[in-house]
Amino acid sequence: MEDSRVYLDRSNATPSYIPVTPQIPVPGLGHRRVKREHVQVDEEPTVQILIKRPKVEDEEVPIPIFPPLPPARDPVAAVAAAGGQIVRRRRRRVPGTAMGVDTVDVVLPVGVRYHPSIEAARPPAVPPPRAVPPVGVRYHPSIEVARPPAARISPPRRRRRRRRSPRPRATAAYRSSAEVVERRRRVAQTVPVVRYHPSIQVEPAVHPPLAPRLPVQMAYTRYHPTIH
């Protein structure tokens, strides 16, 4: 007996469609040889009816209807009562979903700025008690009685003028040689006269006379005939 088994394609190539009828082989359209599970088989074309898969729609959930809030608790009415304004921005859609995000800005007029007081956070400062002498009582001179403190009166301050210090003189490194020589002469002239005791006899220093310098002729020197 000849084997007449038919291998059908169980893979779903179109996920958006679902089968209605089973696969019916059509032998008259030819066949092709393919490899299925390491076995060489002849694949014949089949016919099957498919329909579009219905979309899963969201179930309609009844939305509860809440009673309107009183004006005292209604935020929109509270903003309107305060003279404010509600600004609604453009709706933004969340990518990949059908949801949207609405942003609402509430603008309220600010007339009075609130500054918290430091005194509200700490108790009031109490000044320390002071001993005040009674009025009309005279004490012994040896007893010193402190007078009540009075406001200190400071004299008006005068504006001090800044005196410029004289410019420093140039150092010897920046002075010329003529200035240094002139200064040395001045120092030599201002030396005080020395007076000795009469018992001390000081003779003036005697320097030997300088011998006249004779002209020295260089050895092996030839002069011009005009020089005698």
From Swiss-Prot:
GO terms for biological process: viral release from host cell. The keyword DNA-binding applies. GO terms for molecular function: DNA binding. InterPro entries: Adeno_V. Residues 168-177 have a biased composition (Low complexity). Pfam families: Adeno_PV. Residues 146-177 are annotated as: Disordered. Induction: Expressed in the late phase of the viral replicative cycle. Residues 155-167 have a biased composition (Basic residues). It is found in: Virion; Host nucleus, Host nucleolus. Associates loosely with the viral DNA to form an outer shell around the nucleoprotein-DNA complex and links it with the capsid by binding the endosome lysis protein. Dissociates from the viral genome during entry. Might be involved in nuclear capsid assembly of the viral particles through its association with NPM1/nucleophosmin. Monomer. Homodimer. Exists in equilibrium between monomers and dimers in solution. Interacts with the histone-like nucleoprotein; this interactions bridge the virus core to the capsid. Interacts with core protein X; this interactions bridge the virus core to the capsid. Interacts with the endosome lysis protein VI; this interactions bridge the virus core to the capsid. Interacts with the peripentonal hexons. Interacts with host NPM1; this interaction might play a role in virus assembly. Belongs to the adenoviridae core-capsid bridging protein family. This is Core-capsid bridging protein. It comes from Murine adenovirus A serotype 1. The lineage of its organism: Viruses, Varidnaviria, Bamfordvirae, Preplasmiviricota, Tectiliviricetes.
